[in-house]
Amino acid sequence: MATTAMRMIISIIFISTYVTHITLCQNITEEFYQSTCSAVSRGYLSALRTGWYTSVVTIELSKIQKNVCNSTDSNVKLIKQELERYNNAVVELQSLMQNEPASSSRAKRGIPELIHYKRNSTKKFYGLMGKKRKRRFLGFLLGIGSAIASGVAVSKVLHLEGEVNKIKNALLSTNKAVVSLSNGVSVLTSKVLDLKNYIDKELLPKVNNHDCKISNIATVIEFQQKNNRLLEIAREFSVNAGITTPLSTYMLTNSELLSLINDMPITNDQKKLMSSNVQIVRQQSYSIMSVVKEEVMAYVVQLPIYGVIDTPCWKLHTSPLCTTDNKEGSNICLTRTDRGWYCDNAGSVSFFPQAETCKVQSNRVFCDTMNSLTLPTDVNLCNTDIFNAKYDCKIMTSKTDISSSVITSIGAIVSCYGKTKCTASNKNRGIIKTFSNGCDYVSNRGVDTVSVGNTLYYVNKLEGKALYIKGEPIINYYDPLVFPSDEFDASIAQVNAKINQSLAFIRRSDELLHSVDVGKSTTNVVITTIIIVIVVVILMLIAVGLLFYSKTRSTPIMLGKDQLSGINNLSFSK
């Protein structure tokens, strides 16, 4: 019997395991633009979350007497231990929902408090293993983000008097029903585990019989399996402060999740998309602890609604583009900062700057519009003409030429500068390419790894077509003397404006220097002219004086006849 039971357990585990088949992306094309050191990967289809679908999940609980058959039978002991774990799990869930005023104040403190709490809640979960813990508030955080706003709203309504009974009564004769809550919202409710009827009508009667013996170990195993789900749900809510993501198979099994997807008010194409990508759906879903009362545990499951599907998506990869002609330490660099996922959406483009928030399955891109920016379609011009006049492309600048590599969908961008050695290798042939200084690209065809210095990068092995678009690196158009550095959130227009300001300042400085030089030259000319005039005047005076003097010395004294006669007469008169 034990062997049969073990086979049953193995078969259940096998059936409930979700196996994903990894397929190669088809029709992926990649364009590398040498002028901007960027690459665009195309050929993807969208699956954009635009809304949430909330559903209430219930588990029927049972109030168990503490004194259950004091037999020494081994099977009964196992049952009693399992019942003790069950009781502790229920107590854990009840303590989770206590102290609501504290929850409201804690919700105001928000996500940092939640993160701090989760770090301190990863210790071994003793409460479900038979050791009673001190009562503490584990958290039912309200309003920690718009992502779970709709689920939290439904959870708050379930705390109102009569709401749980309304759900409980609706599920008396069925495992699934639509219930209209007091806030006017209709939600699909489902009962995934009925521990109450099983414990009250099947388990306890067997334990409390006249001889307190259980001859069949299968009874113990069956209860352990049913109880294990409750224990795991309690553990998840406990260590995650009442809100968990992704959605585990304990919260909803695959069959339950597929059934819920089928009941969602969406198109058949959307249902098909979600059903074929269950693991992605789980990653983007939440479960929110609600209430434990009236022998019912209720929690909200919040699933994504992909309102935009099958529109084209592309991913932009960027790497630093630097000059290579200048001396070490004097180079300038420019990097496009608009990297991320882009998807067409109703005449515009949804941009997801944090690419890691999007999940890729084959050639399907699952993104949350809550993490997106809406841009005009002209943003595509940045790939082919970064200096276009219709859209101001985003860049950052620096004067630090750091070598690095960016792995793309079907290749790698390599920014290699200075004395760094950069190579591409094949696992069988070794180094097949050595990169020179600058920005370059290599496809994954025949390439397994890219090495930049001491860092090794493994390229993706997806199939696709790569196109190398050559062009003059735009960084060469800029003058290092006026290039602005450390602009982390700028655009082409802003950088050009700063360059123009610098050039205008230089021109103004030159003009001022020129005007000063001209003034000095004029003054010097005047002074020189005056000096020359003075010297000329002096020279002229000297020349006139010398001329007069020389004429005076060279002219003989002429005596008149009277003077001569008088002299003669005088001489004769003696």
From Swiss-Prot:
Belongs to the paramyxoviruses fusion glycoprotein family. Glycans are attached at residues 27, 70, 120, 500. Residues 76-96, 158-209, 481-516 form a coiled coil. This is Fusion glycoprotein F0. GO terms for biological process: entry receptor-mediated virion attachment to host cell; fusion of virus membrane with host plasma membrane; symbiont entry into host cell; symbiont-mediated induction of syncytium formation. GO terms for cellular component: host cell Golgi membrane; host cell plasma membrane; membrane; viral envelope; virion membrane. The chain crosses the membrane at residues 525-550. InterPro entries: Fusion_F0_Paramyxovir, Tachy_Neuro_lke_CS. Disulfide bonds join 37-439, 69-212, 313-343, 322-333, 358-367, 382-393, 416-422. Residues 551-574 are cytoplasmic. Residues 137-157 are annotated as: Fusion peptide.
